[in-house]
């Protein structure tokens, strides 16, 4: 996969892209990154990338020209048609399902904005996706791009040490992940559930499925609105409801 990041602050990505999973992914050849400062594409001597909004109002708006030209530049270098992603609070709410969709792409371009917003022509004629990582406002799109990049790259084949790790993560199954424990079995009187020490793989798997569902039911019941429950899962939930009364 090839990932281009269009940003006014490329140095923000230096540490993130050279540590942990993202560093390993590059070493394995699973992904390449290019940081592009779109200020360098501004067609004026002062390299201005923003201007006052038509009609008045507070703040400055990113001009279309530098961003269009920067996207044209990286697209000409590509063998594949890219997904062009705009990070903004108005975008589609980001989910694990979206991460899995993007992980199938060969080339992704992220546009990180600043100031009051983008010229609307960027949205209408350049981008393929608008993504928001939550209902809050950040100073710019860089942090949001880092979140999306990390969640996508870890899904690429061969990136994680355990090929099943990404599939077992919270949200990949539609439910939150079950609790985890490691040694010691008794820490300051806090004990690991007996079933995990039993060696009975069938009971362990049942416990994990049940705890995954319970955690989702308690913490993110909204996820169950679109999740297709089995008959057994429905019985578990009914029992928990009775215990609450």
UniProtKB/Swiss-Prot annotation:
GO terms for biological process: tRNA N1-guanine methylation. Coiled coil: none annotated. S-adenosyl-L-methionine binds at residues 113, 133-138. It is found in: Cytoplasm. It catalyses: guanosine(37) in tRNA + S-adenosyl-L-methionine = N(1)-methylguanosine(37) in tRNA + S-adenosyl-L-homocysteine + H(+). It is an enzyme of class 2 (transferase). InterPro entries: Alpha/beta_knot_MTases, tRNA_m1G_MeTrfase_C_sf, tRNA_m1G_MeTrfase_TrmD, tRNA_m1G_MTases_N, tRNA_MeTrfase_TRMD/TRM10. GO terms for molecular function: tRNA (guanine(37)-N1)-methyltransferase activity. It holds the Pfam family tRNA_m1G_MT. It comes from the Bacteria. Its EC number is 2.1.1.228. GO terms for cellular component: cytosol. Keywords: Cytoplasm, Methyltransferase, S-adenosyl-L-methionine, Transferase, tRNA processing. Gene3D superfamilies: 3.40.1280.10, tRNA(m1g37)methyltransferase, domain 2. The keyword Electron transport does not apply. Specifically methylates guanosine-37 in various tRNAs. NCBIfam families: PRK00026.1 (NF000648), trmD (TIGR00088). HAMAP family: TrmD. Belongs to the RNA methyltransferase TrmD family. Homodimer. This is tRNA (guanine-N(1)-)-methyltransferase. It comes from Anoxybacillus flavithermus (strain DSM 21510 / WK1). The gene is trmD.
